[in-house]
Structures are given as structure tokens and as C-alpha cells.
Curated annotation (Swiss-Prot):
Source domain of life: Bacteria
Pfam family, one: IPPT
Record-given protein name: tRNA dimethylallyltransferase
Keywords: ATP-binding, Magnesium, Nucleotide-binding, Transferase, tRNA processing
GO biological process: tRNA modification
Purpose: Catalyzes the transfer of a dimethylallyl group onto the adenine at position 37 in tRNAs that read codons beginning with uridine, leading to the formation of N6-(dimethylallyl)adenosine (i(6)A).
MF annotations from Gene Ontology: ATP binding; tRNA dimethylallyltransferase activity
Amino acid sequence: MIPLIAIVGPTAVGKTALSIRLAQQFNGEIVSVDSRQVYRGMDIGTAKPTPAERAAVPHHLIDIVDPDEAFSLAVYQDLATAAIADIAARGRLPFLVGGTGQYLAAVLQGWQLPRVAPRPDIRAALERQAAELGAAALYARLAEIDPAAAASIPPNNIRRIIRALEVYEATGKPISEQRSVQPPPYHTVTIWLTLPTPALYARIDARVEAMIAAGLLDEVHRLLERGYHWDLPSMSGLGYREFRPYFEGRITLDEAIARLKYDTHAFARRQPAWFRRLPNVLTLPADASDLQQQAATIVRQWIDA
């Protein structure tokens, strides 16, 4: 069994700082679990670790595809599994760090995912239906043909709804019937960082303001100039989609910033639903004065067990 330390928590809670200190202390390397940080050139809006942080500890699965390249849960799972095995084979301790709950669950629970290649023709037709009829209509259809999949997908997550319908139309089988679980060869402990909601929202708002000061608008402008359009999954994600109406002249910058804060608060509220499903979860207050000492004790006891 490969010892594996997962550090999870809502966005802006402090996962990066803690994971770097622990990885330095325990001869570790970090495998990012962030569906947005895989994209090159999307640095500020995804809150990637800084170059100095990435130089301090090796990081994996950051900057691996261009913003217009297809990227899926199955691809992520394969890459993360390979990275974890490589880190362990070199005698180092893998840390799985991030807040994309579905990616975490797929790796730590050993999901066996349907390997159905994207079908652009089917997807385009479904996207047209979504634009014409709304997400609720597609969700109702999914609930009719695959109740199990619908129960696991938020009704407003149109990309996952479309993917589930796409797999069904391509194969004739519900996506839920094509999934199974095979426990992976990991000895995992999950450290879940928490904060009271007001404190977390304050951190999120401060991060958003820091992103603006660091040049997020320039980053978005560069991406658009390079031909990456708003309908790409990368550009329609959190941190970028909120600025579309601003760049199109429909809202003010202050309104776009307020929208980003609001959307990030909502995202942070949804994240814990995934963390509760992870193996061997131990919660720690992210604002504890001895946070690193508490976390280091957990790691030491786990790898010695």
C-alpha cells in the first residue's frame, strides 16, 4: 500500500501553504487536484501556486494542457494515479492537494470510469438544446433515463449533465451503469481544513481583490487575444466567466468583481459535500495557531502506522 496524504478544503482556506510546509518536512511532492489549474496561461484566475512555491516543492498536474484542449475526469485520474506511483517509487511521500471534489473522489475511491471518447456532434446538439430549452429540461431528461446519475449531479451543472447524456447517446447505456469502484492501493488519510463561514468568505474576498491587483483582467484579455473564446470549458469556469459581461460592455468592473466573490462563496459552500465521502477524514481548523504541528502529527502517525 502506498502511503498517501490528502489535504482538502474549500477554496482560499489555506491548503497550498500547509501542503508545501508538510511536503518539505516529510520529503514529499504535491499532486494538484484542481480542474482549472491544469490549463496553461490561466494562472491568476485559478490561484495557482506561485513560481516560488512550485520551486520549493515539486508539483504535478499543473500547466499540462492548453485552454482549448479537451480534458476529462478519466484523463485526470490516469495522470494522478501515474504521478502518485512515480512519487512513491522514488521513495518520496505523495500529497494529493486541492478542492475539486469529483477528482479527489475518483482517485481516492478508485472509480472505474467509462472510457467513452468525446462525441463533438452529440455534444454540440445537446449544447444547442441547453441553450434553447435550459438546463432544467436536460436535467429532467437525464433523471428519466438515468436516475442514479441525475441524483449525483447538481441540476445547474450543465457540463456534467451534457456529458452524462452524451455517454448515453453514444453507447446506449446509462453512465451510472458503466461505473464501478475498485479500491486503489493507497493507505490514505485526509486532512480537511475548515473555517467558520464569515472567516472563509473574508479570505475569499481578499483573494479576489488580490487577483485583480495581480492583473487578472490583463490575463483574461491575453487569453481572448490568443483566440480562446468564452464558450470553452476553461473560459467558462469560475474566475473567468464572471468577466464575460464586463468585457462585452454589459456590466461594470465592480459588478464583475462582486459576481466573482458571490460565485466563489457559492462554490465553497458546495465543496464539503465531496469531502465527506473521502477516506479517513480528520478535520483541522485552518486558523489554528499550531496548524502545522497538528497536521504534522497526523502525517507522522499515519506513515508510521
